[in-house]
């Protein structure tokens, strides 16, 4: 009996995959594809037309991972799911509908070049070989065990189009041999070597910009990677756009500055190393396809002309980052990190400046004292002026959720919604701080941004107003994203470090847990452990968290656009009791220990005695950080003991200043 398959496919390689299944005797129960985008240059074969000609049911749902589609696919009872250049990630519940497994054909030699547009990326990077890989699909994109691979040699004359044709042929050959063996259970699987994995994001037309300060070889590779039918490599010439379709490298640059025209026949441009001959191109997106000398004439170029983008002695404009809540824990550390990089200029607003005094003399740091609920004109102007917006203003301490729930809603939701709408109005990128609290009482072992349920308690437990305010904003931002808003949501998991809070905040109960514990040590009062202190959290060093956030701002290859990213350290899981015990150990060994009273012990306390009846806690909160690894190439590195030590030292020195002031 033939094996039954459900197929997810698009593009020429999608057609090749379907044809291979038909030729090797598989029964295709249904095919899922994408509707063609009229804005794309559709140079490839149509999966929908192929299915129509072969009488195969074909669908193009907006979301194949929707429970209704998963239910329909499950009723087909497929032996296998196959993905051939389908553009969307398939969820674990969908993958589980296949009795014998789900498999993807990827256009590279995994684990190299995971992600989007691998055929273009290998050309951009000057690789001499690539290939195709048949691998098992798992939760993480392109990370499953490998069943078969076939290499493809990349010639210097290859372009994105010719390489794609080679990959299509390689896919047909690989599937012709592998599919019968798969049906017979004869294909062995080999786990990918994660240490060799590389990931590349999607490419956009803007990535084709020619930067003449780079070596000519790099520009040559860019040209052939994005030449027709792709949008092309380009630069500016006066008020016009020069699109380069074919080029070659010539040794030497005659000692001229990058971007200067060495000659117009041939049209030869000096680069940072060697020079690039433009063989064919056009003026603007709607111009005629011309040879280099004719193109130079049309653009008015002469020997010695300078193409825009050449080094002119003027640095490119810094990226302007607006941080609302700049004096807060994340805001002040992030500002410090960005100011170490000359590419950024930071504009900040907050109601105080004690944590950023060290930054105020920096020439690229601009601070205004103000309140987001009052200084609306200043905020709207600066959102319009800046490139990236981080609205970090929020009430984020549990005691306030129960004693001031309306204030939490007004600030955390209503005021922040205004900021989001300004970003929509002026088409600005917003990086919004969601929270690990949105997962609520989720029962998953690891909280996943894309699949975990967000579970909160009853209405009379007011502690959830912070969680649902943030969650609702997440959903609003996601909806605006569907209409064009460029956003990233990041979810911090228990970040700790210097300048986390103030001891005075702990004195009124409005602080994070570690600050409260340190205050108990400093004042010689018992450390209160609510409900036994058995609640587990994953504590993340502020340096690790800020590095991840800086990479989100950098946004290499636009990988973070429209993404939700947990930022936490699952290896640093500990209960609040264990946190207190480690604090005590380091406190007793600290050089300043002699300035403080004796330890008063641990005391178990009911949480409602402190937080009130509106409080409800969660037993654990552990993040999945696969998105952060994949999108940011980031992993946390700081152990919890080091984070605790740095945080403790900061607060003990603050306490010493208080003691000195009293004297």
Swiss-Prot record:
Record GO terms (molecular function): carboxy-lyase activity; UDP-4-amino-4-deoxy-L-arabinose formyltransferase activity; UDP-glucuronate dehydrogenase activity
Binding site for UDP-alpha-D-glucuronate: 396, 401, 435-436, 463, 494, 528-537, 615
Coiled coil: none
Positions annotated as active site in the UniProt record: 106 (proton donor), 437 (proton acceptor), 621 (proton donor)
Any one annotated GO CC term: membrane
Annotated pathway: Nucleotide-sugar biosynthesis; UDP-4-deoxy-4-formamido-beta-L-arabinose biosynthesis; UDP-4-deoxy-4-formamido-beta-L-arabinose from UDP-alpha-D-glucuronate: step 1/3; Nucleotide-sugar biosynthesis; UDP-4-deoxy-4-formamido-beta-L-arabinose biosynthesis; UDP-4-deoxy-4-formamido-beta-L-arabinose from UDP-alpha-D-glucuronate: step 3/3; Bacterial outer membrane biogenesis; lipopolysaccharide biosynthesis
SUPFAM superfamilies: FMT C-terminal domain-like, Formyltransferase, NAD(P)-binding Rossmann-fold domains
Binding-site residues for (6R)-10-formyltetrahydrofolate, renumbered to this chain: 116, 138-142
Highest taxon in the source lineage: Bacteria
Family according to the record: In the N-terminal section; belongs to the Fmt family. UDP-L-Ara4N formyltransferase subfamily. In the C-terminal section; belongs to the NAD(P)-dependent epimerase/dehydratase family. UDP-glucuronic acid decarboxylase subfamily.
Subunit structure: Homohexamer, formed by a dimer of trimers.
Protein name: Bifunctional polymyxin resistance protein ArnA
Gene assigned in the entry: arnA
